[in-house]
Amino acid sequence: IKSTLVAGLISLFISFSSYAEKVKIGDPGWTGATAIANLLAAVVTDKMGGEAELVPGNNTAIYGAIDRSKGEIEVHPDIWLPNQQAYTNDLVPKGTLKLSSKPYEGNQGYCVSQQFAKKFNITAIEDLGRPEVVKAMDSDGNGKGEFWIGADGWASANVNQVKLRDYGLYDAGIEPIRAAEAVKNARVLD
């Protein structure tokens, strides 16, 4: 379904004076960030001979630790812009955060299973607002189709909430659900 192009940037606040140093990499907990954090840790340990530690936390905690510059967390593995622009607008000018000069592009979108898409002829996000689709997405019997928009604290959840409104899905009976990714995954498997 329709995706939004978002630029993801890696914070490069790693300053090795020697390759044997320990780098603390924040892990904000979404699957893409966790994968990138693990890849960065592998590069630090396997290619640079250093040590790496993954430190879990939400964006506020990770950026706060980077800003304090006390070695609590030195790297944010997956900065999504414009979702996290408030953090970068604050920390980059202060010099406590440096963004990669070689950013990569990430795509953010919405998905349904192929089986669901085929059964209900879903080809665009607006199709989720059709009455038969809303009914099929209503797992708790309240008459509204649940739509996972992200976890509490994720800037993307706020963006997704606005997008659902702008697509007219609230008026069509779609209910935005904020929950941890693991909770969402468990619900999908039910």
List each language-model region with its residue ranges.
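Boundary at the C-terminal end of the N-terminal hydrophobic targeting segment
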Residues: S18-A20
